[in-house]
Swiss-Prot record:
Keyword list, A-Z: Ribonucleoprotein, Ribosomal protein
GO MF annotation, one: structural constituent of ribosome
Organism listed in the record: Rhodopseudomonas palustris (strain BisB18)
The protein, known as: Small ribosomal subunit protein bS16
Entry's Gene Ontology cellular component terms: cytoplasm; small ribosomal subunit
Family named by the database record: Belongs to the bacterial ribosomal protein bS16 family.
Pfam families: Ribosomal_S16 (PF00886)
GO biological process: translation
Region (Disordered): 84-110
Amino acid sequence: MSVVIRLARAGTKKRPVYHVVVADSRFPRDGRFIERLGHFNPLLPKDSEARLKLDLDKVKAWVAKGAQPSDRVARFLDAAGVKKREARNNPEKAVPRKERKAAAEAAAKK
């Protein structure tokens, strides 16, 4: 059983609120879950304390048991100092394609 810590959408249309839950990875996103760990309201300002509420003791216990956080939850845990998130390295994304690079070099020579 692969256990993940992820966001489950709640709220109404165009007014999302997310529950931070522990669930089996095979369960639907908004379906069954094992335990609720907190909630996240993206509509509140970023500096608001009510934007994200987590029970850090429960989160630490689930991470110790091997639960894998989703990408967004990993960002939350990194900000809270619970689990370090490794920075992504994608150096090829910013490199221009060969044709554009050649065209830019030709334009620079003129």
